[in-house]
Amino acid sequence: MDKLEECKIKNLYNLDETIAKELLEKFTYPWEVLPHIEEFIIETGKKLSKDEYKEIKENVWVHKTAKIFETAYIDGPTIICENATIRQAAFIRGRAIVGKNAVVGNSTELKNVILFNNVEVPHFNYVGDSILGYKAHFGAGSITSNVKSDKKLVVIKNRITNEQIETKIKKVGAMCGDNVEVGCNSVLNPGTIVGKNTNIYPLSSVRGVIKANSIYKSSDNIVDKI
């Protein structure tokens, strides 16, 4: 078995729930995708149907059913998919894929991310250098931290099995699987991996690999869902 099997793309995400399926299928681990998001968006955007998408500014493609509030700021390259909502004062810094029916809310900032379909980051969230799976949801004020305080390259660690993989990347946020729920005002530290269907309690500081189908109450109190 390869290292950190639970961290593989195939075990975190339903790839049928993202326009980035073709990109993700090329890699084993999700953090390997991060350096390639920009190029993929530009290549994909040029192929999108002009009957369905409008290029509202250079390298920013928005589906005609998406709702963009007037005070939202969107830089490219970015793709915003069908029925997505970008609310007031949202700040999309580019290199962002916002999936179908996704919500990017008030004062939420995105940078170098893939949001699968039906993701919600609705209130005061920061999501950078991260991938959020189908129906993942962040409570108000929850953020991904994408750079270590010592500025060293991020290492993915499972503190239970002591397995680890060097990403060789300085900026890695969080990789959250499908149906992950992150409670209000939580911090997902650099290189955090949260398995499918896992809930994170509010006010948590999370690091390392959190297994699927669990409830994270604190770093020393993680229980299986019943």
Locate the predicted segments by residue:
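Glycine-rich active-site/cofactor-binding loop and its immediate structural neighborhood
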Residues: 62-64, 68-107
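Terminal amphipathic alpha-helical/low-complexity segments used for targeting or macromolecular assembly
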Residues: 1-59, 64, 197, 203, ...
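Glycine-rich hexapeptide-repeat left-handed beta-helix
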Residues: 20-22, 115-117, 122-226
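Conserved hydrophobic/aromatic pocket- or pore-lining residues that grip, position, or stack substrates
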Residues: 29, 84, 113, 136
